[in-house]
Amino acid sequence: EIPPKLEASALKSFPELMEPHVWHDGKMCLAIEKFVSFINLGKRMHWQGTVPFELLKSIESHEQFVNQEHPLFRELEQYKKELRRLYAMAVTIKHYGAVDCILIECPRNIQGVLCARHMDGKPILVLNKYDDKNVMGSLRVPDNVAFDAGAFLQRFMGKIDGLLGGGHEKAGGISFPAHQFA
């Protein structure tokens, strides 16, 4: 659901991006959703939140990108292929009472996607040792489960040196030095 005020503004600013399109899996989406999804690929590949903004700055008009005419589109298509392969990686889900956990070592920022793909009725935490020095984790909670992801992750603050984290009821994230990762 798009908030009505935001939808009205989007329809006025770029109506062609508010038109329905078929997604790669056959589901319907708005053109803007596909555009935003592609822009987010840069962050997943390079770990920096600034990457999507740099990509946006390099595009003179959204039409070039949405119509697949911009050279950046081809690069993002390659990113998408690599990420699809990573999203399908074999994982082992460990069950720890109320929370499931997956441990991976991957240079890409895919924890949140793996949470969504493997969540099965209870909260799931994916911890990714993405280089020799750092671990980043993502916790997701099903909508129908009463569990506060942010409060759960806050319980680890001060117990693991260098851990930073937080979140809200349905999602949260943590990072900590890899030497703390057992």
Annotate each language-model stretch with its function.
Residues 1-98, 103-109, 115-130:
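A structured phosphate/pyrophosphate-recognition subdomain
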Residues 4-9, 97-182:
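Glycine-rich, acidic loop segments that terminate in or are immediately followed by a histidine
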